[in-house]
Protein backbone atom coordinates (compact mmCIF):
# COMPACT_ATOMS: atom_id res chain seq x y z
CA UNK A 1 0.00 0.00 0.00
CA UNK A 2 0.97 3.63 -0.46
CA UNK A 3 1.44 5.09 3.01
CA UNK A 4 1.88 8.54 4.50
CA UNK A 5 3.33 7.98 7.98
CA UNK A 6 2.55 10.42 10.79
CA UNK A 7 4.83 10.44 13.83
CA UNK A 8 7.38 12.50 15.70
CA UNK A 9 9.45 11.07 18.63
CA UNK A 10 11.94 8.22 18.90
CA UNK A 11 9.40 5.40 19.54
CA UNK A 12 7.76 6.28 16.22
CA UNK A 13 11.08 5.80 14.42
CA UNK A 14 10.99 2.05 15.09
CA UNK A 15 7.60 1.68 13.40
CA UNK A 16 8.63 3.88 10.47
CA UNK A 17 11.76 1.81 9.86
CA UNK A 18 9.73 -1.40 9.91
CA UNK A 19 7.29 0.06 7.39
CA UNK A 20 10.17 1.20 5.17
CA UNK A 21 11.61 -2.33 5.31
CA UNK A 22 8.23 -3.90 4.48
CA UNK A 23 6.53 -4.49 1.14
CA UNK A 24 4.56 -1.27 1.60
CA UNK A 25 5.65 2.09 0.15
CA UNK A 26 6.10 5.07 2.46
CA UNK A 27 5.65 8.01 0.10
CA UNK A 28 5.86 10.79 2.72
CA UNK A 29 5.88 11.45 6.45
CA UNK A 30 3.96 13.97 8.52
CA UNK A 31 5.83 15.16 11.60
CA UNK A 32 6.00 18.06 14.02
CA UNK A 33 7.96 21.17 12.99
CA UNK A 34 11.61 21.45 14.01
CA UNK A 35 12.00 22.16 17.74
CA UNK A 36 14.69 23.83 19.81
CA UNK A 37 16.79 21.40 21.85
CA UNK A 38 20.05 21.26 23.76
CA UNK A 39 22.05 23.93 25.54
CA UNK A 40 22.30 26.09 22.45
CA UNK A 41 18.53 25.88 21.88
CA UNK A 42 19.14 25.32 18.19
CA UNK A 43 16.42 24.00 15.90
CA UNK A 44 16.48 20.26 15.26
CA UNK A 45 14.21 18.08 13.12
CA UNK A 46 12.19 15.35 14.82
CA UNK A 47 13.54 11.81 15.04
CA UNK A 48 11.02 10.74 12.39
CA UNK A 49 12.07 13.56 10.05
CA UNK A 50 15.72 12.56 10.36
CA UNK A 51 15.02 8.93 9.44
CA UNK A 52 12.79 9.92 6.53
CA UNK A 53 15.47 12.25 5.16
CA UNK A 54 18.04 9.45 5.35
CA UNK A 55 15.79 7.36 3.10
CA UNK A 56 14.93 10.19 0.71
CA UNK A 57 11.29 10.27 1.82
CA UNK A 58 9.35 13.52 1.54
CA UNK A 59 8.89 15.24 4.92
CA UNK A 60 5.85 17.41 5.69
CA UNK A 61 6.02 19.61 8.81
CA UNK A 62 2.74 21.54 9.12
CA UNK A 63 2.25 23.71 12.20
CA UNK A 64 -1.45 22.81 12.07
CA UNK A 65 -3.79 20.49 10.20
CA UNK A 66 -6.79 22.78 10.61
CA UNK A 67 -8.52 23.66 7.35
CA UNK A 68 -8.57 27.40 8.09
CA UNK A 69 -4.76 27.64 8.26
CA UNK A 70 -2.29 28.06 5.41
CA UNK A 71 -0.43 24.89 6.43
CA UNK A 72 -3.69 22.98 6.73
CA UNK A 73 -4.75 23.91 3.20
CA UNK A 74 -1.32 23.01 1.81
CA UNK A 75 -1.42 19.60 3.50
CA UNK A 76 -4.84 18.84 2.07
CA UNK A 77 -3.59 19.61 -1.41
CA UNK A 78 -0.43 17.55 -0.98
CA UNK A 79 -2.28 14.54 0.46
CA UNK A 80 -4.66 14.62 -2.50
CA UNK A 81 -1.65 14.53 -4.83
CA UNK A 82 0.06 11.72 -2.91
CA UNK A 83 -3.15 9.64 -2.86
CA UNK A 84 -2.18 7.36 0.05
CA UNK A 85 -4.11 4.16 0.74
CA UNK A 86 -3.63 4.60 4.49
CA UNK A 87 -1.99 6.92 7.01
CA UNK A 88 -0.40 4.98 9.90
CA UNK A 89 0.15 7.11 13.02
CA UNK A 90 2.54 6.72 15.97
CA UNK A 91 2.75 9.57 18.49
CA UNK A 92 2.28 12.30 15.88
CA UNK A 93 1.26 15.01 18.33
CA UNK A 94 -1.27 16.98 16.28
CA UNK A 95 -5.05 16.87 16.16
CA UNK A 96 -6.36 15.19 13.02
CA UNK A 97 -9.45 17.15 12.07
CA UNK A 98 -12.76 15.53 11.11
CA UNK A 99 -12.60 16.44 7.43
CA UNK A 100 -9.25 14.67 7.07
CA UNK A 101 -10.39 11.32 8.46
CA UNK A 102 -11.55 10.06 5.05
CA UNK A 103 -8.58 11.33 3.04
CA UNK A 104 -7.49 7.73 2.31
CA UNK A 105 -9.47 4.53 1.63
CA UNK A 106 -8.25 2.91 4.86
CA UNK A 107 -8.19 6.14 6.86
CA UNK A 108 -5.72 6.90 9.64
CA UNK A 109 -4.55 3.90 11.70
CA UNK A 110 -3.03 4.65 15.08
CA UNK A 111 -0.60 2.47 17.03
CA UNK A 112 -1.43 2.96 20.72
CA UNK A 113 0.67 1.50 23.51
CA UNK A 114 -2.07 -0.13 25.60
CA UNK A 115 -4.85 -2.67 25.21
CA UNK A 116 -7.74 -0.36 24.44
CA UNK A 117 -10.05 0.73 25.92
CA UNK A 118 -7.55 0.65 28.81
CA UNK A 119 -5.46 3.80 29.15
CA UNK A 120 -6.72 6.02 26.39
CA UNK A 121 -4.73 9.25 26.23
CA UNK A 122 -1.19 10.56 26.22
CA UNK A 123 0.65 8.39 28.77
CA UNK A 124 -0.58 4.78 28.62
CA UNK A 125 2.80 3.15 29.33
CA UNK A 126 3.37 5.18 32.48
CA UNK A 127 -0.18 4.56 33.68
CA UNK A 128 0.03 0.80 33.23
CA UNK A 129 3.16 0.60 35.40
CA UNK A 130 1.97 3.12 37.97
CA UNK A 131 -1.35 1.36 38.49
CA UNK A 132 0.18 -2.10 38.82
CA UNK A 133 -1.12 -3.72 35.64
CA UNK A 134 0.39 -7.12 34.98
CA UNK A 135 -0.53 -7.29 31.30
CA UNK A 136 -0.44 -4.50 28.75
CA UNK A 137 0.22 -4.37 25.04
CA UNK A 138 -0.34 -2.39 21.87
CA UNK A 139 -3.41 -1.75 19.75
CA UNK A 140 -3.87 -0.63 16.18
CA UNK A 141 -7.17 1.15 15.64
CA UNK A 142 -8.84 3.38 13.09
CA UNK A 143 -8.87 7.00 14.23
CA UNK A 144 -12.28 8.62 14.58
CA UNK A 145 -13.48 11.86 16.17
CA UNK A 146 -13.06 10.62 19.76
CA UNK A 147 -10.00 10.22 22.00
CA UNK A 148 -8.62 6.78 21.11
CA UNK A 149 -12.16 5.46 20.62
CA UNK A 150 -11.97 4.02 17.09
CA UNK A 151 -12.57 0.42 16.04
CA UNK A 152 -9.80 -2.02 16.92
CA UNK A 153 -7.91 -3.66 14.06
CA UNK A 154 -5.22 -5.71 15.85
CA UNK A 155 -3.65 -6.15 19.29
CA UNK A 156 -0.56 -7.70 20.86
CA UNK A 157 0.06 -8.41 24.56
CA UNK A 158 3.11 -7.86 26.77
CA UNK A 159 3.79 -8.87 30.37
CA UNK A 160 5.01 -6.05 32.61
CA UNK A 161 8.12 -7.15 34.49
CA UNK A 162 8.67 -6.27 38.20
CA UNK A 163 11.61 -4.00 37.36
CA UNK A 164 10.28 -2.42 34.16
CA UNK A 165 10.68 1.33 33.85
CA UNK A 166 8.52 3.30 31.43
CA UNK A 167 11.50 3.41 29.09
CA UNK A 168 11.98 -0.38 29.24
CA UNK A 169 8.33 -1.09 28.49
CA UNK A 170 8.01 1.57 25.79
CA UNK A 171 11.09 0.23 24.02
CA UNK A 172 9.64 -3.29 23.91
CA UNK A 173 6.24 -2.07 22.76
CA UNK A 174 7.80 0.15 20.09
CA UNK A 175 9.32 -2.95 18.47
CA UNK A 176 6.43 -5.37 18.91
CA UNK A 177 3.98 -2.59 18.06
CA UNK A 178 5.95 -1.72 14.94
CA UNK A 179 5.58 -5.30 13.76
CA UNK A 180 1.88 -5.13 14.60
CA UNK A 181 1.49 -1.97 12.52
CA UNK A 182 3.10 -3.62 9.50
CA UNK A 183 0.85 -6.66 9.93
CA UNK A 184 -2.16 -4.36 10.18
CA UNK A 185 -1.26 -2.60 6.92
CA UNK A 186 -0.92 -5.97 5.20
CA UNK A 187 -4.17 -7.23 6.68
CA UNK A 188 -6.05 -4.15 5.50
CA UNK A 189 -4.59 -4.51 2.02
CA UNK A 190 -5.55 -8.19 1.83
CA UNK A 191 -8.94 -7.72 3.46
CA UNK A 192 -8.23 -10.19 6.27
CA UNK A 193 -8.94 -7.83 9.19
CA UNK A 194 -12.38 -7.53 10.76
CA UNK A 195 -12.63 -4.27 12.74
CA UNK A 196 -14.29 -4.61 16.14
CA UNK A 197 -15.70 -2.06 18.53
CA UNK A 198 -13.92 -1.39 21.80
CA UNK A 199 -15.54 -3.25 24.69
CA UNK A 200 -15.35 -2.79 28.45
CA UNK A 201 -14.83 0.19 30.72
CA UNK A 202 -12.39 2.79 29.46
CA UNK A 203 -9.60 4.20 31.61
CA UNK A 204 -7.63 7.35 30.86
CA UNK A 205 -3.96 8.29 31.03
CA UNK A 206 -3.60 12.04 30.80
CA UNK A 207 -0.34 13.81 30.00
CA UNK A 208 2.06 13.65 32.95
CA UNK A 209 3.28 16.85 34.58
CA UNK A 210 6.37 17.34 36.71
CA UNK A 211 4.13 17.75 39.75
CA UNK A 212 2.55 14.35 39.08
CA UNK A 213 5.98 12.75 39.47
CA UNK A 214 6.54 13.86 43.09
CA UNK A 215 6.93 10.91 45.47
CA UNK A 216 4.49 10.55 48.37
CA UNK A 217 6.49 8.65 50.98
CA UNK A 218 3.36 7.88 53.01
CA UNK A 219 2.23 5.47 50.27
CA UNK A 220 2.98 1.72 50.50
CA UNK A 221 6.44 0.63 49.37
CA UNK A 222 5.13 -1.21 46.29
CA UNK A 223 3.17 1.88 45.18
CA UNK A 224 6.28 4.05 45.50
CA UNK A 225 8.32 1.48 43.57
CA UNK A 226 5.81 1.55 40.69
CA UNK A 227 5.58 5.36 40.84
CA UNK A 228 9.34 5.74 40.44
CA UNK A 229 9.56 3.22 37.60
CA UNK A 230 6.58 4.77 35.81
CA UNK A 231 8.29 8.17 35.74
CA UNK A 232 11.73 6.90 34.67
CA UNK A 233 13.38 8.45 32.75
CA UNK A 234 10.94 11.29 32.20
CA UNK A 235 9.85 13.49 33.78
CA UNK A 236 11.69 11.70 36.61
CA UNK A 237 10.28 10.86 40.03
CA UNK A 238 11.43 13.42 42.57
CA UNK A 239 11.42 14.41 46.20
CA UNK A 240 12.79 17.27 48.31
CA UNK A 241 15.35 17.41 51.10
CA UNK A 242 15.28 20.74 52.91
CA UNK A 243 14.95 23.09 49.89
CA UNK A 244 16.65 20.90 47.28
CA UNK A 245 14.71 18.88 44.69
CA UNK A 246 16.27 15.52 43.90
CA UNK A 247 15.34 13.02 41.21
CA UNK A 248 15.07 9.43 42.39
CA UNK A 249 15.92 6.43 40.23
CA UNK A 250 14.37 2.95 40.53
CA UNK A 251 14.80 1.32 43.92
CA UNK A 252 17.32 -1.45 44.56
CA UNK A 253 16.01 -5.03 44.47
CA UNK A 254 19.37 -6.57 45.33
CA UNK A 255 18.63 -7.65 48.91
CA UNK A 256 16.51 -7.45 52.02
CA UNK A 257 16.33 -4.27 54.08
CA UNK A 258 17.78 -4.95 57.51
CA UNK A 259 16.27 -2.06 59.45
CA UNK A 260 13.36 -1.50 61.78
CA UNK A 261 10.07 -1.61 59.91
CA UNK A 262 8.82 1.45 61.79
CA UNK A 263 11.13 3.91 59.99
CA UNK A 264 8.88 6.95 59.45
CA UNK A 265 7.71 7.77 55.91
CA UNK A 266 10.43 9.79 54.20
CA UNK A 267 12.95 9.25 57.01
CA UNK A 268 16.44 8.54 55.63
CA UNK A 269 18.85 5.99 57.08
CA UNK A 270 22.28 6.13 55.44
CA UNK A 271 24.20 2.87 55.83
CA UNK A 272 27.70 2.01 54.65
CA UNK A 273 26.66 0.85 51.19
CA UNK A 274 23.01 1.81 50.95
CA UNK A 275 20.39 4.45 51.65
CA UNK A 276 17.12 3.27 53.20
CA UNK A 277 13.94 5.36 53.23
CA UNK A 278 10.78 4.81 55.23
CA UNK A 279 7.44 4.45 53.48
CA UNK A 280 3.85 3.87 54.53
CA UNK A 281 4.68 0.18 54.90
CA UNK A 282 8.18 -1.34 54.70
CA UNK A 283 11.38 0.65 54.05
CA UNK A 284 12.98 0.64 50.59
CA UNK A 285 16.59 0.85 49.42
CA UNK A 286 17.30 3.64 46.96
CA UNK A 287 19.25 2.87 43.80
CA UNK A 288 20.33 6.22 42.38
CA UNK A 289 19.75 9.89 43.14
CA UNK A 290 20.27 12.98 41.00
CA UNK A 291 21.03 16.16 42.99
CA UNK A 292 20.27 19.56 41.40
CA UNK A 293 22.69 20.39 38.58
CA UNK A 294 24.42 17.00 38.68
CA UNK A 295 24.17 13.62 37.01
CA UNK A 296 22.42 10.59 38.45
CA UNK A 297 24.67 8.88 41.03
CA UNK A 298 24.69 5.94 43.42
CA UNK A 299 22.54 6.79 46.44
CA UNK A 300 25.18 5.69 48.97
CA UNK A 301 27.81 7.91 47.30
CA UNK A 302 25.37 10.81 47.39
CA UNK A 303 24.66 10.27 51.10
CA UNK A 304 28.36 10.26 51.98
CA UNK A 305 28.85 13.50 50.08
CA UNK A 306 26.04 15.43 51.77
CA UNK A 307 26.70 14.01 55.28
CA UNK A 308 23.10 13.43 56.32
CA UNK A 309 22.15 13.97 59.94
CA UNK A 310 19.95 11.58 61.93
CA UNK A 311 16.85 13.72 61.42
CA UNK A 312 17.15 13.86 57.62
CA UNK A 313 13.81 13.32 55.92
CA UNK A 314 12.48 13.53 52.38
CA UNK A 315 9.36 15.61 51.95
Curated annotation (Swiss-Prot):
Task: Please name the GO terms that the record assigns under molecular function.
Answer: methionyl-tRNA formyltransferase activity
Catalytic activity reads: L-methionyl-tRNA(fMet) + (6R)-10-formyltetrahydrofolate = N-formyl-L-methionyl-tRNA(fMet) + (6S)-5,6,7,8-tetrahydrofolate + H(+)
Q: What is its EC number?
A: 2.1.2.9
Q: Where does (6S)-5,6,7,8-tetrahydrofolate bind?
A: 114-117
Gene Ontology CC: one annotated term: cytosol
Return the SUPFAM superfamilies for the record.
FMT C-terminal domain-like, Formyltransferase
One Pfam annotation, family name?
A: Formyl_trans_C
Which Cys residues form disulphide pairs? Answer: none
Keywords attached to this entry: Protein biosynthesis, Transferase
Q: What does this protein do?
A: Attaches a formyl group to the free amino group of methionyl-tRNA(fMet). The formyl group appears to play a dual role in the initiator identity of N-formylmethionyl-tRNA by promoting its recognition by IF2 and preventing the misappropriation of this tRNA by the elongation apparatus.
Homology family? Belongs to the Fmt family.
Q: What is this protein called?
A: Methionyl-tRNA formyltransferase
Organism encoding this protein: Corynebacterium glutamicum (strain ATCC 13032 / DSM 20300 / JCM 1318 / BCRC 11384 / CCUG 27702 / LMG 3730 / NBRC 12168 / NCIMB 10025 / NRRL B-2784 / 534)
Gene responsible for this protein:
fmt
Amino acid sequence: MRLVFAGTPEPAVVALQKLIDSDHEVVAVLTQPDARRGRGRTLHPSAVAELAQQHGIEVLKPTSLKADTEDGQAIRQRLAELAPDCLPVVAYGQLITKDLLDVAPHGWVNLHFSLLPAWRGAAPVQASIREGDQITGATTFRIDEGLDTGVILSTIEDTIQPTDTADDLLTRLAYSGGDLLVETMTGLEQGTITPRAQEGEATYASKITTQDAQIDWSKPAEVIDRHIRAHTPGPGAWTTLVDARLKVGPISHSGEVEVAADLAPGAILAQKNSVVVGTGTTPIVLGNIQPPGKKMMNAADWARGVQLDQEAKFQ
